[in-house]
Amino acid sequence: MDKLLERFLHYVSLDTQSKSGVRQVPSTEGQWKLLRLLKQQLEEMGLVNITLSEKGTLMATLPANVEGDIPAIGFISHVDTSPDFSGKNVNPQIVENYRGGDIALGIGDEVLSPVMFPVLHQLLGQTLITTDGKTLLGADDKAGVAEIMTALAVLKGNPIPHGEIKVAFTPDEEVGKGAKHFDVEAFGAQWAYTVDGGGVGELEFENFNAASVNIKIVGNNVHPGTAKGVMVNALSLAARIHAEVPADETPETTEGYEGFYHLASMKGTVDRAEMHYIIRDFDRKQFEARKRKMMEIAKKVGKGLHPDCYIELVIEDSYYNMREKVVEHPHILDIAQQAMRDCHITPEMKPIRGGTDGAQLSFMGLPCPNLFTGGYNYHGKHEFVTLEGMEKAVQVIVRIAELTAKRGQ
């Protein structure tokens, strides 16, 4: 465990922020830097079958140290950080033996407060790694990367029985491209776990069904003084569309298993406007109903427009709820839960109000629930991780490897 913090601090010092709307994968050069560093470290650690694909997927194998019919299992994390907040010049603060109250984030007025983030009350006495208030931290998912690398070092350096362990580090997870170029057959695991969750004990095998909705509105602009009966204001049509979306089914009004519509961006002029929504729901039927709702709204608002004016709506599915794939293999969850209990952790099964690479991989033939990392408040300046939580994640990874070996012997 000695190098866990050192690894994490090294990884977050590299700017690996991904970029949306870019065709190339990885979308940024910084991700290549971390992937090449990890490749070098895996080689130095003595892993085999190390490959780094042209699309930035790094894979490696830790050979089994016991004989038997032991399934090969995998652990996966992503190297990119969210494009939502700066990941450049990350300057972590280490707060040892947290005693409660506000934590100043750098020099200025920014604080990490238990008033806004009550989970801090549960972390008294622990070592917290925070931002300086100017960037995100990058625990999502460099905590997972550091934990997998440390678990490999533990397994390599100790006589802990384990089967073949596969690891992979992917790019562009935050922009939805992490698993698109993942070669499941080449990876060679029967199942895997993404290490990309939150607080200690989280074990996630349910995620949103997700879709994007892009709306283009073409209006007609004339001088306002002579506009009667002629002007078609694209911005007004956009406002009418959004007014039809259920106001109590948005991210800020929902939780748990509740789905939502989210207006992520809107721009335009009288002549043209564009809107971008995301749709999320755990239930597949409700998910399909939400997509139909958006089509009905566009049809209603666009009814009776001049032929030269129109509303164009394009819906694209992003990923689906992996539950239906993971529950077909209950032993995957059983092993993870037992590993947590063996490490004196109470498993907390909760839905992911988002997505992971594991969601797409599960539909590609690699069942892949999500393990905790010990991090909180991702994608912003209030992001932090606990050293104790990271250590627990390493212990759980190692124990999963050990329990899997016992099942096959």
Curated annotation (Swiss-Prot):
Binding site residues for Zn(2+) 1: H78, D140, D196
List required co-factors.
Answer: Zn(2+)
| Keyword hit for Transcription | no
Where would you say this protein principally sits, based on its record? cytoplasm
Q: What the protein does?
A: Cleaves the N-terminal amino acid of tripeptides.
PANTHER family recorded for this chain? PEPTIDASE T (PTHR42994:SF1)
Please state what the protein is called. Answer: Peptidase T
The species this protein belongs to is: Salmonella enteritidis PT4 (strain P125109)
Identify the gene encoding this protein: pepT
